[in-house]
């Protein structure tokens, strides 16, 4: 079935449709970054087929008891809205709440009964064990045996969803029949979105939009096709005072100690190439240990940061790097600077813009490794890493991305450069490239039986001249849209 209102998400739609056609009960968990479109996907695919929906609310309560009762009240009101009798007693705990849900569903005579529990981490609350235990009992004792139930749980707190639902070792252990991790749009999906919403942007502008908003549907929905991209960025980031709250909202509610998470994200935002665990812990003033590891795991699972190996002269270091485009833009241009109408038009010709664009374009490329792999005709990437070593003159050389394909005994050294026009390699940069190649060939990381390919990844291609002779392959912005 075609869904004209949904861009991309083809595999996810197929899964949801299969669950609906199944001859048994299905228990599905959907997770992903806040604003990525999880609720929208379920509501569009299942439309009028949802029998009951409850949504958790992020609230600040004085104590756990009042927090739980507020969520129970909302759950009860959702039952009333769905058609449960008005004289039904209000639940005081989760066992009673799920008993009411069972009673309501038993009175529904349809082929499939779809239950959608949205923002489950908020619904369950900080002390979530009771709610999760009762959800497990509801599924194990009744819903699973009905054979016509589709139970969908959804949450933006990815690490919570993994710990309490997907990898749970209690009552939900082994009960899930399907999981969906919803990712941001790719460049190609963003292009489809823009075209379907009446935008006529160049691919260069689409890339700049991606570098500002990421592939986050909620942010793209805020753009106005009657305005230029510059005007839209001004309106979204520089004129709307709510932008500061939106940045906090990405993290508030996802984690119990959101301030700690914000400290780490802001610190990483000041170091584009990232920091080691030790460097990061020292910078934010937190001890190395289980709590710190959990925070990093949570941010990684939520798609906010990435971890990658950086090969140096003596050892391999694990580096943590901010990868959330919205957060990167906010921290570079907005945080602590206030808002000023028209700022983006001014900034686009400043060194600050080119610094941000150069760094962020590298992240855009890394986030589109499958497209790079396809262009380079690489069957298998055995390793991808950052390399740092000493050049012949003693200076430190860095190759931001090395792709290793053992099957062809080839290492692809990728240089990523952002430019509005064709990128020109001059005499000085040719010399730098030669030094990088020499240093890499003589490093411990280079397998001596491997050949190398110098790959330039640019927006508009490399301008042909006498200094570009060492470039073996090129990847352009058009290739990343595939």
Locate predicted features.
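A cross-kingdom feature that marks ATP-driven nucleic-acid transaction machinery
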Residues: 5, 311, 318-482
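Phosphate-binding site recognition
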Residues: 1-347, 454
């Amino acid at each position: 079935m075609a869904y004209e209102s949904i861009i991309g998400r083809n595999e996810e739609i197929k899964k949801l449709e299969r669950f609906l056609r199944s001859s048994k009960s299905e228990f599905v968990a959907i997770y992903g970054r806040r604003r990525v479109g999880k609720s929208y996907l379920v509501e569009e695919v299942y439309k009028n087929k949802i029998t009951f929906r409850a949504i958790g609310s992020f609230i600040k309560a004085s104590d756990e008891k009042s927090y739980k009762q507020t969520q129970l009240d909302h759950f009860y009101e959702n039952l009333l809205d769905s058609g449960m009798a008005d004289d039904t007693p209000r639940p005081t705990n989760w066992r009673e709440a799920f008993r009411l849900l069972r009673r309501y569903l038993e009175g529904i005579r349809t082929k499939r009964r779809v239950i959608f529990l949205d923002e489950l981490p908020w619904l369950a609350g900080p002390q979530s064990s009771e709610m999760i235990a009762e959800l497990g009992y509801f599924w194990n004792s009744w819903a699973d045996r009905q054979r016509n139930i589709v139970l969908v749980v959804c949450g933006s707190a990815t690490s919570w969803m993994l710990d309490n639902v997907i990898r749970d070792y209690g009552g939900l252990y082994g009960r899930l029949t399907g999981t969906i991790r919803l990712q941001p749009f790719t460049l190609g999906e963003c292009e489809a979105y823009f075209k379907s919403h009446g935008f006529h942007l160049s691919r260069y502008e689409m890339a700049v939009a991606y570098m500002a908003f990421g592939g986050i549907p909620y942010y793209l929905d805020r753009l106005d096709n009657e305005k230029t991209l510059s005007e839209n960025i001004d309106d979204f980031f520089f004129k709307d005072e709510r932008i500061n709250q939106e940045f906090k909202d990405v993290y508030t509610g996802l984690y119990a100690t959101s301030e700690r998470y914000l400290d780490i994200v802001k610190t990483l935002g000041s170091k584009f190439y990232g920091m080691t665990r030790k460097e990061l812990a020292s910078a934010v003033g937190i001890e190395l240990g289980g709590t710190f590891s959990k925070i990093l795991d949570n941010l990684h699972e939520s798609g906010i940061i990435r971890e990658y190996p950086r090969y140096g002269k003596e050892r391999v270091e694990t580096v943590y790097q901010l990868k959330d485009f919205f957060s990167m833009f906010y921290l570079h241009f907005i945080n602590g600077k206030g808002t000023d109408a028209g700022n983006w038009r001014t900034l686009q010709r400043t060194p600050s813009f080119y610094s941000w664009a150069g760094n962020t374009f590298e992240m855009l490329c890394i986030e589109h490794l499958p497209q790079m792999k396809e262009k380079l005709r690489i069957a298998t990437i055995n390793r991808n890493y950052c390399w740092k070593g000493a050049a012949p003159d003693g200076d430190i050389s860095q190759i931001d991305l090395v792709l290793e394909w053992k099957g062809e005994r080839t290492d692809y050294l990728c240089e990523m450069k952002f430019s509005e026009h064709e990128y020109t390699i001059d005499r000085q940069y040719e010399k730098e490239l030669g030094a990088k190649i020499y240093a890499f060939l003589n490093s411990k990381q280079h397998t001596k039986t491997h050949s190398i390919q110098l790959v330039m990844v640019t927006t508009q291609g490399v301008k042909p001249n006498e200094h570009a002779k060492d470039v073996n392959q090129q990847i352009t912005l058009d290739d990343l849209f595939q």
